[in-house]
Design a protein with these regions (language model features):
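Generic short beta-strand segments
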Residues: 103-109
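A short, structured loop/turn motif at beta-sheet edges
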Residues: 91-99, 126-133
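Hydrophobic/aromatic beta-strand elements that line small-molecule binding cavities or substrate pockets
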Residues: 86-91, 106, 120-126
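Short, low-complexity N-terminal intrinsically disordered segments enriched in polar/charged residues
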Residues: 1-45, 146-149
């Protein structure tokens, strides 16, 4: 008897586990859509999202999927900044298959003033079983002009 008969067959309704590259693509799409729900749904329940370069009024980290959801809902909901494009500079694989490092530039507009801005960034994503477990998000939030400036 062949060993293939003993291998488990996934149920047709079972979603495929996303690779780190696929998670990164979904992450960028959530940014473009300004969707805190789509973003948070990429995270494990106990994930941590860190901002090593903090900006005034912005927390240094979110702990847990629901904190990510609430934090981005508040930040994106209050901001007149609209992301127009995420320019993907590079994505680097590491010796750890669950880690991807991505360079990008966010291009957007401040809808209250029609001001264009660009903000370079770097993400280090840890993805386990298709969900983000940790993010180190190196973005200089001061690159986004304020609504009143």
């Amino acid at each position: 008897m062949s060993s293939e008969w003993n291998s488990p067959v996934p149920h047709p309704d079972t979603p495929a586990v996303r690779t780190p590259h696929e998670v990164l693509t979904c992450y960028y799409q959530a940014m473009l859509d300004k969707s805190p729900d789509d973003l948070a749904d990429l995270y494990a329940v106990d994930a941590v999202h860190e901002f090593p370069f903090t900006s005034p009024g912005f927390p240094p980290r979110y702990e847990g999927r629901e904190a990510v959801r609430a934090g981005y809902r508040a930040a994106w909901g209050a901001s007149p900044a609209q992301v127009q494009e995420v320019r993907r500079i590079a994505a680097y694989e590491t010796t750890d298959p669950e880690v991807i490092i991505a360079e990008h530039v966010v291009v957007g507009t401040l809808t209250t003033k029609a001001t264009t801005f660009t903000v370079p960034g770097l993400l280090i994503l840890h993805v386990h079983n298709g969900l983000i477990t940790r993010v180190r998000d190196y973005m200089d939030g001061s690159g986004v002009p304020s609504a009143g400036a």
